[in-house]
Amino acid sequence: MSIVDVRTPDPKRFIPGATGDWEVIIGLEVHAQVLSNSKLFSGASTEFGNAPNANVSLVDAAMPGMLPVINEECVKQAVRTGLGLKAKINRRSIFDRKNYFYPDLPQGYQISQYKDPIVGEGKIIISIGPDRQGQFEDVEIGIERLHLEQDAGKSMHDQHPSMSYVDLNRSGVALMEIVSKPDLRSSDEAKAYLTKLRSILRYLGTCDGNMDEGSMRADVNVSVRRPGAAFGTRCEIKNVNSIRFVGQAIEYEARRQIGILEDGGTIDQETRLFDPNKGETRSMRSKEDAHDYRYFPDPDLLPLEFDDAFVEALKTDLPELPDDKKDRFVRDLGLSVYDASVLVSEKAIADYFEAVAEGRDGKIAANWVINDLLGALNKAGKTIEETPVSPAQLGGVIDLIKAGTISGKLAKDLFEILWNEGGDPAEIVESRGMKQVTDTGAIEKAVDEIIAANPDQVEKAKAKPSLAGWFVGQVMKATGGKANPQAVQALVKSKLGIEE
């Protein structure tokens, strides 16, 4: 298969070396565990965290005479993913045996797909930025293919001083291997691609994307070249289980290869691993080619065939995906591209925002969700699923502001109370005397006292009207933030003789 270079060299992404500029070429092979209750070819459970070898059937253990039976739900999940990636769905695909020996691969081969995968070419649009002007750059990254395959088991080397144990709980679990084209040109692009892909999978409900549990991991192919030259020799960094680590591995590996080439050496095609503790890649073995695996069609499995009606039925039931949701937020709610991008980055955040925004001003709801809620969650190290403030509670805060019951400052205090103690926003405002002061007489008295106590500041404000804001701040402080800010501002300007 020939590899086509579709990207025009971009000087913004060049890496400066001692002898000139270099360009890094990146391709990603993402292994995403299919969200399914049972494995690809057996009825064994896929539940994470069970005791070793608790989720193992006779098929998973490769007992003699046991034959694989395809899990239809895994097939549907792969097709849904292909549709979400705007990819070609192949109506006929074939399962192959990929032959190699690992202690945790009991069959002595892995059932995968080689020449005829279930999903063909697709694409993902990633956004890079914002730059100093606040602009985003959209980049199209090609998808080469998506195929279904079995996961292997896990060798455990820390259970006994002189022996290794094997846990087959993951053996036979369905994986989607999603292979990008070599279209990525920086570690930032690679991280953006993985973030976007994970978001799409979560929206579709085809993979939970939990990299810390191993349900999504990446093999990272890296090579370097002079800008515009032919592709260089690539190295593959296996099983990187964090988006941040993927970025670090690419940065290190690109520098390593550039250093070798600038010293007159050559790059060996090899498989490497990333050590996150040292922030470096290390050689594991020479890189295999396809012929080393001796692929051939699995004689125990018929070709996988389905018609247009099968695909169309799945397409009809697809949820709204991140890009479409972002466009709707910008178009219908008037959000900025940046705010909409933040809100759709995770399905749970988008769902929370939509619950808050329903029947309310979308921009105000977005401001509270992004700045106050997500800010508090980040500070506390919590996820949106762990938020102590429900959409109904946050919506209640916004309603109280709109009704003029509380000021913006008091709303911040109310949010803190909800975060720490919970409760009903309206009841808290009532019981704690947090209602905004709208009585003009009470506000006027406070304004008069501040003006009388600061004659020097009065003269300055008359000479420079913008300084009237100082008086507004002092009145708000004197009233504990309860005064209506608009009423205070109008009274201050009136008392100082400043025209609106």
From Swiss-Prot:
Looking up Gene3D superfamilies in the UniProt record yields:
1.10.10.410, GatB domain, N-terminal subdomain (1.10.150.380)
Record keywords: Ligase included? yes
What EC number(s) is this enzyme filed under? 6.3.5.-
Q: Which reaction does it catalyse?
A: L-glutamyl-tRNA(Gln) + L-glutamine + ATP + H2O = L-glutaminyl-tRNA(Gln) + L-glutamate + ADP + phosphate + H(+); L-aspartyl-tRNA(Asn) + L-glutamine + ATP + H2O = L-asparaginyl-tRNA(Asn) + L-glutamate + ADP + phosphate + 2 H(+)
Entry's Pfam families?
A: GatB_N (PF02934), GatB_Yqey (PF02637)
Alphabetized GO MF terms: asparaginyl-tRNA synthase (glutamine-hydrolyzing) activity; ATP binding; glutaminyl-tRNA synthase (glutamine-hydrolyzing) activity
Q: What does this protein do?
A: Allows the formation of correctly charged Asn-tRNA(Asn) or Gln-tRNA(Gln) through the transamidation of misacylated Asp-tRNA(Asn) or Glu-tRNA(Gln) in organisms which lack either or both of asparaginyl-tRNA or glutaminyl-tRNA synthetases. The reaction takes place in the presence of glutamine and ATP through an activated phospho-Asp-tRNA(Asn) or phospho-Glu-tRNA(Gln).
The record's note on quaternary structure and interaction partners says: Heterotrimer of A, B and C subunits.
Q: Which NCBIfam families match?
A: gatB, PRK05477.1-2, PRK05477.1-4, PRK05477.1-5
* Matches recorded under PANTHER family: GLUTAMYL-TRNA GLN AMIDOTRANSFERASE SUBUNIT B MITOCHONDRIAL AND PROKARYOTIC PET112-RELATED, GLUTAMYL-TRNA(GLN) AMIDOTRANSFERASE SUBUNIT B, MITOCHONDRIAL
Q: What is this protein called?
A: Aspartyl/glutamyl-tRNA(Asn/Gln) amidotransferase subunit B
Q: Which organism is it from?
A: Sinorhizobium fredii (strain NBRC 101917 / NGR234)
